[in-house]
Amino acid sequence: MRNFLEEFYKIEDLLHDKARFTVDLFQNGVSVWNSLDEYEKILNRYHYNVRLFILSYNPDLSVLLKDNDSEIRRVALKLIWDGLIDLSNDELLIKILISLSITGNDEERKLAQVILINRGWLERHEKILLTIVERLYGEGFDYYLFKDMGEFFYNIKNINLLMAHIEKGKNIQDDEINELIADFSNIIKGQSL
């Protein structure tokens, strides 16, 4: 698995190094058009290298997303983020992404949420979302899970789930959760999602 990570990091580092070089060119007076043209070449090379990487390793992204190593999960999320593989019908992967969107570490939550939102996978897989939400409610929650779930519902612009979440929280006798309920309620009142 170390080779897998090292090879991906080489591809990623090459992208970052070349992108920095292009930014430096632009800042040193090279025309915008030339800088954009150069950056497009860099991105094309990056996507080509990622495709070769995927063909070489043929990774099972669902398995990688469930790995205990957060580095491996991050690489899997970045491979999905790049959008080079159509995963829109992979229900297991969608379940894992939804779970990571709520219960993952900060970086995982952000990446998984952006993937789900940008690809429109939540609309197509609403039953999966509702099943995961009900499972999480059944397991009970603390301040952090309540906060992360509320933020997730806000980020996906699902006011119905956010309002239902607030109602569920009202049954819990916890001052910190009550503060979150007030914050989420103010968000709903202050703007329409």
Language model features with spans:
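Ankyrin-repeat helical core positions
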Residues: 65-66, 80-85, 98-102, 116-117, ...
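Alpha-helix N-cap/helix-start positions at coil->helix boundaries
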Residues: 70-71, 102-107, 139-144, 174-178
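N-terminal alpha-helical scaffold/docking segments in eukaryotic complex subunits
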Residues: 1-82
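Amphipathic alpha-helical scaffolding segments comprising HEAT/armadillo-like alpha-solenoid repeats
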Residues: 52-64, 87-100, 123-136, 159-169, ...
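Structural detector for internal amphipathic alpha-helices that build alpha-solenoid repeat scaffolds
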Residues: 28-52, 74-87, 110-122, 144-156, ...
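Context-gated lysine
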Residues: 10, 18, 41, 66, ...
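Eukaryotic acidic, Ser/Thr-rich intrinsically disordered low-complexity regions
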Residues: 2-12, 16, 160-193
